[in-house]
From Swiss-Prot:
Gene: N
UniProt name for this protein: Nucleoprotein
rRNA processing as UniProt keyword: no
Extra facts: Displays a superantigen activity in human and mouse, activating mostly V-beta-8 subtypes of T-cell receptor.
SUPFAM superfamilies in alphabetical order: Rhabdovirus nucleoprotein-like (SSF140809)
């Protein structure tokens, strides 16, 4: 009998078969470039830049844009934005540019052109007679790139927010060094006619390329990033949250991870810190891996590292951070357990509340205050029935360690203390909770104080 088969009976008939499952075509893919080739796309025939400008501008005024033509124009316009590379630019072994070289966004990627003509002749443009200036080209490019940022704003009750963002971005591209090329509210009207720009692979690729360039090169038109900046660390919310977390608690990544007391963290931490990636390399392809098509399913997203994401934001909630209170809970990743651990870590790193003395007249006054607080804490812990007398050394002011926190959790049977619950209620009850947010979770779970 083959070792990979099982045997059982169905209606008294012996059946032998090999269990098989569907192959996962959506496994996490790491963005490291292994073949030494720049990321690339294929577009239609390069247009005459001035003809393309007139056609695209006419289409924008009519709120009717052809995505293929928009992409072709954005790629052709890259050559207008020349700058000087400040340092040798290398990523994953690929030499993008040398220090002092004159470069434009196209040097970052490989854009292949076919002989397929665009729809320029059919798209209009007759209402624009004279050839555009450099400032007008830059403004149109900027407005087109802003469509990506607007399409990334999703959720309930975002209409007014989107309109305000669109208006502010329009204002940027009608003042020097740019030039006004459209009437007020044109950007929002165009967005409404086609709201899914962020799902168009070639458009996303070009937006990421522009952002990678202007993040690296000082340029008079660097304000173009107002529409592209959302491509930086896109689908990286798990890793970004962890980075913010260690800065908040002022520990190294290694020391911070010693506090992660849950078996489900193991796979997530292994996934998040896979060797061979350029997570800490400035201006790497890694920063824009999603836009550049280097990863279909990010191993760094909040869903990929859900337990880590939940814990970090429960600690953030304990610290009163609005961003954490508004973040969306990953419901499938043990939010109740993560809220317990988050309470203990919040107390460890933040204390019992927001208000405490932080500034003193001199070092002696600061030292006296610290000693007084340590004595007060030790006295209160000695009276706490949950603490065994021979375990009290774990709670002294001199001992702030993962071992101490772990012992505290175990002695309380893996449950939050009332001081933790009171803190959670205090920070979440006065916050206008969004649906499925951490604030809503805390309000629902701990509203009765237990």
């Amino acid at each position: 009998m083959e070792s990979d088969k099982i045997v059982f009976k169905v209606n008294n008939q012996v059946v032998s078969l090999k269990p098989e499952v569907i192959s996962d075509q959506y496994e996490y893919k790491y963005p490291a470039i292994l073949d030494g080739k720049k990321p690339g796309i294929t577009l239609g025939k390069a247009p005459d830049l001035n003809t393309a400008y007139k056609s695209i501008l006419s289409g924008m005024k009519a709120a009717k844009l052809d995505p293929d033509d928009v992409c072709s124009y954005l790629a052709a316009a890259m050559h207008l934005f020349e700058g000087v590379c400040p340092e040798d630019w290398v990523s994953y072994g690929i030499v993008i540019a040398k220090k002092g070289e004159k470069i434009n966004p196209s040097v970052i990627v490989d854009i292949v052109r076919t002989n397929v003509e665009g729809n320029w002749a059919q798209a209009g443009g007759t209402d624009v007679i004279r050839d555009p200036t450099m400032a007008e080209h830059a403004s149109l490019v900027g407005l087109l790139l802003c469509l990506y940022r607007l399409s990334k704003i999703v959720g309930q009750n975002t209409a007014n927010y989107k309109t305000n963002v669109a208006d502010r971005m329009e204002q940027i591209f009608e003042t020097a060094p740019f030039a006004k090329v459209v009437e007020h509210h044109t950007l929002m009207t165009t967005h409404k006619m086609c709201a899914n720009w962020s799902t168009i692979p070639n458009f996303r690729f070009l937006v990421g390329t522009y952002d990678m360039f202007f993040a690296r090169v000082e340029h008079i038109y660097s304000a173009l990033r107002v529409g592209t900046v959302v491509t930086a660390y896109e689908d990286c919310s798990g890793l970004v949250s962890f980075t913010g977390f260690i800065k908040q608690i002022n520990l190294s990544p290694r020391d911070a991870l010693l506090y992660f007391f849950h078996k489900n963290f193991e796979g997530e931490i292994k996934r998040m810190f896979e060797p061979g990636q350029e997570t800490a390399v400035p201006h790497s392809y890694f920063i824009h891996f999603r836009a550049l098509g280097l990863s279909g399913k990010s191993p760094y997203s909040s869903n990929a590292v859900g337990h880590t994401f939940n814990l970090i934001h429960f600690v953030g909630c304990y610290m009163g951070q609005i961003r954490s209170l508004n973040a969306t809970v990953i419901q499938t990743c043990a939010p109740h357990e993560m809220s317990v651990l988050g309470g203990y870590l919040g107390e460890e790193f933040f204390g019992k509340g927001t208000f405490e003395r932080r500034f003193f007249r001199d070092e002696k006054e600061m030292q006296d205050y610290t000693e007084l607080e340590e004595a007060r804490v030790e006295a209160s812990l000695a009276d706490d029935g949950t603490v065994d007398s021979d375990e009290e050394d774990f709670f002294s002011g001199e001992t702030r360690s993962p071992e101490a926190v772990y012992s505290r959790i175990m002695m309380n049977n893996g449950k939050l203390k009332k001081v933790h619950i009171r803190r959670y209620i205090a920070v979440s009850s006065n916050h206008q909770a969004r649906p499925n947010s951490f604030a809503e979770f805390l309000n629902k779970v701990y509203a009765d104080g237990s």
